Amino acid sequence: MRMCAPVRGLFLALVVVLRTAVAFAPVPRLTWEHGEVGLVQFHKPGIFNYSALLMSEDKDTLYVGAREAVFAVNALNISEKQHEVYWKVSEDKKSKCAEKGKSKQTECLNYIRVLQPLSSTSLYVCGTNAFQPTCDHLNLTSFKFLGKSEDGKGRCPFDPAHSYTSVMVGGELYSGTSYNFLGSEPIISRNSSHSPLRTEYAIPWLNEPSFVFADVIQKSPDGPEGEDDKVYFFFTEVSVEYEFVFKLMIPRVARVCKGDQGGLRTLQKKWTSFLKARLICSKPDSGLVFNILQDVFVLRAPGLKEPVFYAVFTPQLNNVGLSAVCAYTLATVEAVFSRGKYMQSATVEQSHTKWVRYNGPVPTPRPGACIDSEARAANYTSSLNLPDKTLQFVKDHPLMDDSVTPIDNRPKLIKKDVNYTQIVVDRTQALDGTFYDVMFISTDRGALHKAVILTKEVHVIEETQLFRDSEPVLTLLLSSKKGRKFVYAGSNSGVVQAPLAFCEKHGSCEDCVLARDPYCAWSPAIKACVTLHQEEASSRGWIQDMSGDTSSCLDKSKESFNQHFFKHGGTAELKCFQKSNLARVVWKFQNGELKAASPKYGFVGRKHLLIFNLSDGDSGVYQCLSEERVRNKTVSQLLAKHVLEVKMVPRTPPSPTSEDAQTEGSKITSKMPVASTQGSSPPTPALWATSPRAATLPPKSSSGTSCEPKMVINTVPQLHSEKTVYLKSSDNRLLMSLLLFIFVLFLCLFSYNCYKGYLPGQCLKFRSALLLGKKTPKSDFSDLEQSVKETLVEPGSFSQQNGDHPKPALDTGYETEQDTITSKVPTDREDSQRIDELSARDKPFDVKCELKFADSDADGD
């Protein structure tokens, strides 16, 4: 039952995912829209799917592989195109592709999928080529294809929608993709002229994999003598250990040896070193499991003892948009392959488990191990010399029982409401000498998250919208060359180049420190936030604190204020701009905090302050503060200061004679203070209204606070047209016309309701009296009376069919006037006699029913 634990964890995750998602919400501190920061773009009209990126650090050139084209652009400014070459599909191939049921407009094209360095003067390029994958060599000098047209089967996918990955190792291409047209035969292969290898076509080896990443880890100088280089493949596949009604996906890491040459008799031209293990990325305390692998990045840095794998995961049932980042050390991965237990296929009754741990003897040399000095000492100099027993064991047991666990046994980052697609990681040194890992993670909506791994937390520094449209980022590339650090992102529409930091966007020392960006520091000398490692000046005196402590920011700049004049009874809007998503905006007036619950105040966008019904008591100084909590400490900084003065505007009645002589311009000047409700200046001559200037400074207080006045540009114009504020007396005719129209409409509706009878009973009597004189109105029970008459007449009709005479209907008491004249009034005795003469079959069905069945005749019994 131990093997069912991962599955139980997955099902538990599916149950608690909605409950636990709320807790995983690290919000980016800053959000940059597409036009707010300096981004460089490259796009060629008519070309799409920029999914292959390759950097040449020596030449400062970025190679871009797109649909039917390859470009070379300047790595420092990708908008500068250097070279281009097109690789289009012939019409004949397009027609043959369309005959196979594929789209001629979208699928039967040449999508560049492999773009790898072959030598210093050439690139190895492969494309889907209308479902006929083809590879060629691209000469970098002439930037033209050499026309080799090699078969790309097993190196490049047939379908552009199928997964793929590749890496060039020593001039040999290692790739993971599909091997046939349908994509039903997955393969991990090595393209070599002297020793090509591939995986066994068997479900235990690869079961519907989705390839994500591949890279080579060279042997360590401190490792055992004679150790071989290893190539790692990362993918997600359908589980072979468990079987359910749905396909359970499992993330894997597989390893092959560079020196593998296949077996002599068993596993000929097949990998003899292929082993795979499960990757664990889960939160133990919540049971949340992330089992869909999206991307992997290998972090290599001089300060690291060994490479670290950073991987992006999402849950299989990701209906709430959860993503996670887990990190794995190379030693942990190698320990599973070199010392871990194997699994074997078994049938367990009444269980979903299909594979269990193998506890039997393991052959020597160890199956799946690379040829090292120990194997050579035992005369196993090559995989061709390995015994069949070892090779058969590898063929039957490619899956490891032990799993690869992440660092600290938990994800580095869990983020909700986002789907991460790609990741790159940079290791940088802060001002205090500490090294930090900074992750750049792209989303399926074209955004880039930047997060730094601190001692006890992961801080999401910022979110940058790379593309105007919310399109997924297909690939990420990091250039960490000293003095030139950029992130390149490719999507379906183009490529975007972004710097690793936007330090210049932080306008104050507090804001620069609170960003907790290891790339940024505050320079008191130039009073600006600068980028580390890119400034030639000395860093002496720079301020940076990764804990967010702003106590070192002693250089307080002079505080400026905005002065406003408003009329009594109006509404004032005081603006405050705060960029941090982690900060809370607080408004203070006379050392007291203003609350939105008060009917006196309101907030626009949780930042700007609205003051209603201004009075003399509202005059004073209003301060907008930003309170941001960092590591159980609240950091407060002043964002804006407003000096508000409320004045009573005297109303002088205009002279009747002078009012007629006034021009439209004089009216505006005299009524300007009344019309100004959003922050106009006090009443001044008309010349001042046309030439606004800075407000007069108030006298300095005894507290000694240095405040520098700031010119106020009102949010509304100083001059308003009178007709936009008041309704002229000459326009009363418009109001009277409107009222008259409403009255006529009311009369029409009333007349229509009277005609249709859609009125209460009293009104109907009044209507009848007016229209019909003394005629008695029709009773409200006329419908009921008619129903009674029809009920009493119907039996007579049936009796007439049987040859009997029809019986007269009962007297209802509502005969017409002519009927009462031509007939006499019946007595009580006659009425009772007529009722007794009614036969049983003439009575209503619901009075007396002796029928056995509803559709039978009464006389048929």
Swiss-Prot record:
One GO location term (cellular component): semaphorin receptor complex
Extracellular topological intervals: 24-733
Membrane disposition: Single-pass type I membrane protein
Biased composition (Basic and acidic residues): 826-839
Ranges of residues in domain Sema: 24-500
GO molecular function: receptor ligand activity; semaphorin receptor binding; signaling receptor binding; transmembrane signaling receptor activity
UniProt-annotated glycosylation sites, renumbered to this chain: N49, N77, N139, N191, N379, N419, N613, N632
Boundaries of every Ig-like C2-type domain copy: 555-636
A Pfam family matched in the record: PSI
Transferase recorded as keyword: no
Cytoplasmic face residues: 755-861
Regions of compositional bias (Polar residues) in chain numbering: 657-681
Tissue: Strongly expressed in lymphoid tissues, especially in the thymus, as well as in the nervous tissues. Expressed in neurons and glia in the developing hippocampus.
Listed GO biological process terms: axonogenesis; bone trabecula morphogenesis; leukocyte aggregation; negative regulation of cell adhesion; negative regulation of osteoblast differentiation; negative regulation of transcription by RNA polymerase II; ossification involved in bone maturation; positive regulation of axonogenesis
Top-rank taxon, per record: Eukaryota
Region (Disordered): 649-709, 793-839
Record-annotated PSI domain positions: 502-551
Modified residues (Phosphoserine): S782, S832
Location(s), subcellular: Cell membrane
Keyword Transport: no
Similarity comment: Belongs to the semaphorin family.
UniProt xrefs under PANTHER family: SEMAPHORIN, SEMAPHORIN-4D
Subunit organization: Homodimer. Interacts with PLXNB1. Interacts with PLXNB2.
This protein's name: Semaphorin-4D
The species this protein was found in: Mus musculus (Mouse)
Gene that this sequence comes from: Sema4d
